[in-house]
Amino acid sequence: MGGRGGSMGGSHGMSGGGGAAKAAAPKAPAQTREQKLLAQIKGNPAAILKMSDQDAADTVTAIAKQRIRTNGTQNNTFVQRYLNAIGFSDSKPQLLSDSAYEKARMKAKEVSMYHADKNFGGKTGDHYNKQLQSGDTMFASNGYYGGGTYWAWGSASASSGYGRYQCKGFLNSKARVITTDQLDKMGRSFSARHPKTYAALVKARAGYGGTDETLYSFLAASHGYNVIQRGSRKTAGTYMVTLDRSALTMSTKTIKNAQQGMTNW
């Protein structure tokens, strides 16, 4: 309204001097309580641990109500909604040519991890590899060790059982790793200290039935971690679950013929 003062009031009130005063800009609608709670954790997942148990539980309930994309780029689970809510789904990996990737990996003294996809929903596994590498959102897969992106540490062969389309990456300096053993202990403490929040998480979780998939990802991210490692020791084929692609340096190279017994590439 303010920018149209001349046409709205020019025939009277404009001739005397300073012209019509600009109308005040309309006030933005007040945020709801749910919106305020969600705003606190966006980019700051640890904020939920500073809330009262009731506020944290209500935040979990609010997350469970959030919309997700329905074009196949996101998963219809609580973990996907949670990673969206804290801003983890939007980050991207460092993506390098294969030669630059190998130089960076050797300099960092890291081991390649392998992720495999299969054809699904009318799209090829290669399409999903590309989404992981450079898509504007991350698909949070289901799994026993937390919802996120699953990798086989140091074993292309172990990864191949999940699809013949394969990509690779290593954990960079932004990775913060926590083990499932640590999360189990953390979960027992959390459920005792935050019973309402824990109950809300149990109610909200979807994925692998009665597993701690939702609790693992929630606890890891809220305590400052973005990678979950199965068990306390890494051996070839150990499951690694990334919650945030910024923890990854990836090669642009992909393959379409992954199979059991293959060598690492």
What is each residue range found by the language model?
Residues 1-26:
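Intrinsically disordered, low-complexity segments
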Residues 34-150, 161-265:
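Active-site and NAD+-binding cores of ADP-ribose-processing enzymes
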Residues 155-157:
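Short, polar loop motifs at secondary-structure junctions
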